[in-house]
Amino acid sequence: MLFRSLVQFAVVAYMGWRWHNIAVDGIPYQWRCVPRLEVSAFGTDYVRVVFPEDTTQWKDDTPPEKGQQIYVYISRDTSGLMEIQGASASKPFVGGDYMQATVVSYQDGFVQFQVGFDRYRMAPELTDGIYNLQPDDSVIASIRMKRGEGVIEGIFVNGIPLENISNGAAMAKARQEKEAQTLFDRPHLVDTGMVPPKEE
């Protein structure tokens, strides 16, 4: 039992260190995404992030196999969004950006892939903003990439953090504004400039 707890702690600690390392030194990217609510094995809430742009041209002569690790070549377009430039069993030449992925399927020269950074942790009370998303909303994941691995720093809906469009965020903001109201800001029953008449 103790060994299992130590292993779980070590895994969580390593993931935390890896996330911090990539977040500090990684190259920033923006990628279109669709957030979904799920619950992890540890019982904490998180957002499952689906990336619709998950299919690209296969650059090699030998077709990939399902489950194989591949390298997806990436760049940025003029607006700063990530562009997928194809995939291969080999890393790109020096200077080329890429992300590691796993093959989901292959057909007619195109490979469907899945990346390893498909989760984004959020406080449970702030996740309900997902239900307010509209089909025409611009939903972007802010990502950092380093040596093929990535982490999601944030999810933005029309430029606003996903956390900020939740009912929980609205309630917290209203609570803060109410607490910030000082005694002097509150309405008084008697105006301080008025003096009650002297009784005789």
Predicted regions and their residues:
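Aromatic-capped interface at the extracytoplasmic side
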Residues: 11-33
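Extracytoplasmic/periplasmic terminal helices and flexible tails
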Residues: 72-75, 82-87, 95-200
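Short, Lys/Arg- and Gly-enriched loop/turn segments at beta-strand edges
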Residues: 55-66, 79-85, 150-152
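Extracytoplasmic
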Residues: 26-28, 46, 67-69, 79, ...
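Anionic-ligand-binding alpha/beta catalytic cores of soluble enzymes and soluble regulatory domains
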Residues: 50, 63-76
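Short extracytoplasmic
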Residues: 32-63
